[in-house]
Amino acid sequence: MALRFPRFSQGLAQDPTTRRIWFGIATAHDFESHDDITEERLYQNIFASHFGQLAIIFLWTSGNLFHVAWQGNFESWVQDPLHVRPIAHAIWDPHFGQPAVEAFTRGGALGPVNIAYSGVYQWWYTIGLRTNEDLYTGALFLLFLSAISLIAGWLHLQPKWKPSVSWFKNAESRLNHHLSGLFGVSSLAWTGHLVHVAIPGARGEYVRWNNFLDVLPHPQGLAPLFTGQWNLYAQNPDSSSHLFGTSQGAGTAILTLLGGFHPQTQSLWLTDIAHHHLAIAFIFLVAGHMYRTNFGIGHSMKDLLEAHIPPGGRLGRGHKGLYDTINNSIHFQLGLALASLGVITSLVAQHMYSLPAYAFIAQDFTTQAALYTHHQYIAGFIMTGAFAHGAIFFIRDYNPEQNEDNVLARMLDHKEAIISHLSWASLFLGFHTLGLYVHNDVMLAFGTPEKQILIEPIFAQWIQSAHGKTSYGFDVLLSSTNGPAFNAGRSIWLPGWLNAVNENSNSLFLTIGPGDFLVHHAIALGLHTTTLILVKGALDARGSKLMPDKKDFGYSFPCDGPGRGGTCDISAWDAFYLAVFWMLNTIGWVTFYWHWKHITLWQGNVSQFNESSTYLMGWLRDYLWLNSSQLINGYNPFGTNSLSVWAWMFLFGHLVWATGFMFLISWRGYWQELIETLAWAHERTPLANLIRWRDKPVALSIVQARLVGLAHFSVGYIFTYAAFLIASTSGKFG
């Protein structure tokens, strides 16, 4: 009996029903709730699992390199990045039959293959990889790192190598190590790689281990560094006629501030990127020497926080007590980490298309669309997770005595004001935006499009103008041709920036109008409503007017009966669950907007977006319906084309999504009856009755059914849109 799953909870292991399996899976990673867990074991388990995570990441990236080297066409793609389609890997069994084999044999391959829309080809090319041998070498190196990570994870679980709790709670040492050791040193190393390998590679010089020490990255070597003439490293940059990967039009500069894009590759100048990483390295190496460790110099985090008491008493005792609260709560730390990572991931989405760093990626439209959408969805999930762990912190780790009258306690004290203001903002945005859209819909329906309410986003246009966009005619700051900032920009800093901003072939500062104004506010509605649900869930996690003793019920309790006036949708878990729907909804609007605006930009018919995006029917008809037609014809009675796999995924995504509602809109008594009936029939059917359950089948709990429903809803939603996005973009632009 002792070996039954889950081993970490004897109580669950002895449960006679199928709850055992469900609750076992649900609490497998909740180390805090496991039998005989101690604080020390908790920290050690998490630390060891980080190495496991790293091992998986290294193995996965190694697999990407290996499969492209084995089954891809990297070497022929390098010869002509704009016209050869990059191959991700072979397809063993294309569906269905000979027409499918022919449809998927492309990119110069001998058999059926998948096209890569991840941007790895452009990335590897930009950083100096050129041959399949390079890819195999990289794959082997990452495989080696993966093995090292696994060994490190195992090692840190052995008695002799287990770190102590005091080691985990040494905030200053960890800060110094992460800032200097991880960010600083890795950025410096990356600058080194760019200067020694990638930039020579972009100029037609093949640098590898055999000639690495013979090739000078700059004609003057290290002399300018030691003599203080650093400006020499910026002189003679690549010319605007430079052909990437060749010496034609190449310069000798290694660290520049050109700004804008390389005319041929449409990506940022590699020498600008190297300069950026060097600056980041410098900042983080300095930052990583600021905190007090064994040497008695530098800042103490505790002293810093204790000293943060704003004058005038407006924030009470300021940051007093925060150090111990944060340092002793893993959930608080995880919440902060997830919030930061979520924002960073969304910024990656925004910057990968507006300031593309990889050669030729801007001309690979499907990849641009896929990467933007991918990073926005990931950001959404990570950000909602931040609030989930914030709520768990309030339930499990928050100590009111330790935080009396500090900023944290004051957040809880005036939560009603915070929640009601967020609620007001959401209602205002929702009703006004929908009102404008619906008004415009009605005007179109009655044949009077001139009666639409169209609002120019003048403030946003003014901000774009201030950064140098001249087409609006604002004549302000960088768009004012006779201003000092404009003239300085021509020579001193980023001379290519203003050209890039006003060039219409890239995605930097796209021209915006009434359609953008409306969808911007629709997205603002989604963001504010998601935030409202998440903030309310976290701030009410310990208790609310209706249920003041919520803390004693934990994070994910089900309804507490009708006694308090009904307590469904009131646990912190319920708030997270509802927020994820809003998050998906919001990211949907964000990606619809991005994709449609870019499709019309790439096709050269921006007026379609401008005219149709001001009313809902325009979005439904001219974006969704119009762009799904090719996809739905992936296979039809006449045969199969290369979009068939996406057509199938589109259908399958809808199926998974719809299945979610079976769990979301369900009455538990009915499910229990259904399960009992199925079990009864099973036990009385020949052959089927040879299989017996050890556990008595019972219906899912309310919380479980919501989780299963949410998982299906999310997966189906994302599968459906991914198929639509990739098929509609690749169908148009090859």
Curated annotation (Swiss-Prot):
CC cofactor note: P700 is a chlorophyll a/chlorophyll a' dimer, A0 is one or more chlorophyll a, A1 is one or both phylloquinones and FX is a shared 4Fe-4S iron-sulfur center.
GO-annotated biological processes: photosynthesis
Enzyme class: oxidoreductase
Record's catalysed reaction(s): reduced [plastocyanin] + hnu + oxidized [2Fe-2S]-[ferredoxin] = oxidized [plastocyanin] + reduced [2Fe-2S]-[ferredoxin]
One family name in Pfam for this protein: PsaA_PsaB
Residues that hold phylloquinone according to the record: W671
Record membrane topology: Multi-pass membrane protein
InterPro entries the record matches: PSI_PsaA/B (IPR001280), PSI_PsaA/B_CS (IPR020586), PSI_PsaA/B_sf (IPR036408), PSI_PsaB (IPR006244)
Compartment(s) of residence: Plastid, Chloroplast thylakoid membrane
Entry GO CC: chloroplast thylakoid membrane; photosystem I
EC numbers, comma separated: 1.97.1.12
UniProt-annotated binding residues for [4Fe-4S] cluster: C559, C568
Stretches that traverse the bilayer: 46-69, 135-158, 175-199, 273-291, 330-353, 369-395, 417-439, 517-535, 575-596, 643-665, 707-727
Keyword S-adenosyl-L-methionine: no
Protein origin, superkingdom: Eukaryota
Subunit annotation: The PsaA/B heterodimer binds the P700 chlorophyll special pair and subsequent electron acceptors. PSI consists of a core antenna complex that captures photons, and an electron transfer chain that converts photonic excitation into a charge separation. The eukaryotic PSI reaction center is composed of at least 11 subunits.
Role of this protein: PsaA and PsaB bind P700, the primary electron donor of photosystem I (PSI), as well as the electron acceptors A0, A1 and FX. PSI is a plastocyanin-ferredoxin oxidoreductase, converting photonic excitation into a charge separation, which transfers an electron from the donor P700 chlorophyll pair to the spectroscopically characterized acceptors A0, A1, FX, FA and FB in turn. Oxidized P700 is reduced on the lumenal side of the thylakoid membrane by plastocyanin.
Protein name from the UniProt record: Photosystem I P700 chlorophyll a apoprotein A2
